[in-house]
């Protein structure tokens, strides 16, 4: 019996330790957006086109890297269910393998087009290099089960203050609403 209790306790503690706290609810009072115009408005990185193409489009124009930094744009590769890929803006780094991002249009159905602030993203890559991530899934109240290939981080020209960056999420969504479709 003591062995079972120890096993149960370690499983419970492990489950608690591996689950980040829930992020705030999606922003109310902001228009529905695609991820690209929102990421452009919040990060100041002036790239266009499908999200997955941002990595190559940044070459020679913006620094790129494998490490997260506030204001950097995380570029996720396209998949069969996410044909344009996805971009999100790093707000802050929580730990070696966890960041918080702001993004738009993550999800489907009623979640489509919403702007979400302070969303956990976890590095699950075997080499700890941010090449494979899992993203918080609001409707399920936990990390999504899908692993997404990440192309890397497109870095802004200057490093923004994380507090100001987080405060600019809603204003950036309103700015992006005027640039939809580009």
Regions from the PLM with identified roles:
Residues 25-89, 94:
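Secreted/periplasmic proteins that engage bacterial cell-wall peptidoglycan
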Residues 3-8:
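N-terminal export leaders
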Residues 9-10, 169:
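Intrinsically disordered, low-complexity segments enriched in polar/charged small residues
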Residues 17-19:
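Bacterial signal peptide processing site
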């Amino acid at each position: 019996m003591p062995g079972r209790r120890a096993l149960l306790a370690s499983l419970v503690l492990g489950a608690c330790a591996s689950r980040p706290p829930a992020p705030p609810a999606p922003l109310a009072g902001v228009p529905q957006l695609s991820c690209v115009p929102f990421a452009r408005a919040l990060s100041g990185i002036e790239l266009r086109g499908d999200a997955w193409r941002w990595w190559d489009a940044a070459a020679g124009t913006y620094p790129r890297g494998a490490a997260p930094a506030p204001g950097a744009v995380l570029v996720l590769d396209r998949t069969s269910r996410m044909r344009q890929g996805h971009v999100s803006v790093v707000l802050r780094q929580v730990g070696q393998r966890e960041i918080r991002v702001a993004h738009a249009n993550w999800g489907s159905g009623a979640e489509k087009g919403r702007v979400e602030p302070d969303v956990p993203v976890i590095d699950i890559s075997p080499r700890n290099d941010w090449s494979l991530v899992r993203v918080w899934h609001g409707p399920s109240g936990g990390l999504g089960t899908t692993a997404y290939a990440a192309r890397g981080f497109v870095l802004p020209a200057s490093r923004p203050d994380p507090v100001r960056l987080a405060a600019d999420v809603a204003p950036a969504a309103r700015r992006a609403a005027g640039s939809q479709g580009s």
